[in-house]
Amino acid sequence: MLEKLMEVENKYEKITQTLSDPKVFSNKDEYMKYSREQAELEPIVTKFREYKRILKQIEEAEEMIKSGDPDLKELAEEELQQLKKIKPQIEQELKVLLLPKDPRDEKNVILEIRAGTGGEEAALFAANLFRMYAKYAESKGWKVEIIDSHPTGLGGFKEIIATISGKGAFSKLKYESGVHRVQRIPVTEASGRIHTSTATVAVLPEAEEVDIKIDEKDLRIDTFCSSGPGGQSVNTAYSAVRIVHIPTGIIVQCQDERSQIKNREKAMKVLRARLLEIERQKKEAERAAERKGQVGTGERSERIRTYNFPQNRVTDHRIGLTLYKLEQVLNGNIDEIIDALISYYQAEKLKEM
């Protein structure tokens, strides 16, 4: 690890030198490129320099103990004890900082939520989940835009698709893919029995045009009048867009905007994200040995979390985390869950190093 850290520090120092070169400073693109590289390496270098200071202080404390002065020895032993506690903590932090970065982490998100088993109750739960993620995004200063939705009469959603744009959106939300389960007494239930319903969540990184090429010849594009709950037409203009990707059979549609052009752009965003996910899963299947290390990959059969209303409980089954603060969680306070998931999967990756 030390060798790797020294390499990173040398690279950082070279980049810092390069940034002070007037030629680079006057070239905006070059300057931005090196500044980004420097910013990426800075946390590792800062932590490594802290680690080197700790090693030096340990060495000095050990020298003091050997010196034979009783007063100095007592002080040095106390300091050494403290330093030896700090050292493994910093080593762990450095290991985490050296983990390979997921290139998708800085991407915006395409969020897809679909009602699963449970009829109207599942649709209401899908709406609860969408509100939870929208509130969480708002707390982070991210932007949420609905691309397509299929509302039900009671305020639920059979399906809702949205983009979430903001720094680090995918890195935080990528472990939310999977089956979410709710246990509660439905508003439609007269006998007061607890029902179990589900909704599936898919979190995809938004794909740029450079990430995936789509041949226009492979697309069939239909336009239609947008509709509201129950299927009634709410717009006489043919502004809604449905795109069929012929080779894969993927169908996406968008009717959220009044403009056909904007609806087409949004639908293409979803199509690109889904095609990129297919590519990723294909590569993942080819590397079967790595599959264990891939988490939250959107396996729809995987039940990841239960929201139990009578017990005010949320349980994430992957990491065995249980919180008794359901209302706060559904109001978007999910940092505790997300941070625990990130820490867990970082630890899993460290085992593989």
Swiss-Prot record:
CC terms in the record's Gene Ontology section: cytoplasm
Any one GO molecular-function label of the UniProt entry: translation release factor activity, codon specific
Residues annotated with N5-methylglutamine modification: 232
PTM section of the record: Methylated by PrmC. Methylation increases the termination efficiency of RF1.
Record keyword rRNA-binding present: no
This protein's UniProt keywords: Cytoplasm, Methylation, Protein biosynthesis
Subcellular localization, as worded in the UniProt entry: Cytoplasm
NCBIfam families: prfA, PRK00591.1
Function: Peptide chain release factor 1 directs the termination of translation in response to the peptide chain termination codons UAG and UAA.
UniProt-listed HAMAP family: Rel_fac_1 (MF_00093)
Family: Belongs to the prokaryotic/mitochondrial release factor family.
Protein name: Peptide chain release factor 1
Organism encoding this protein: Thermodesulfovibrio yellowstonii (strain ATCC 51303 / DSM 11347 / YP87)
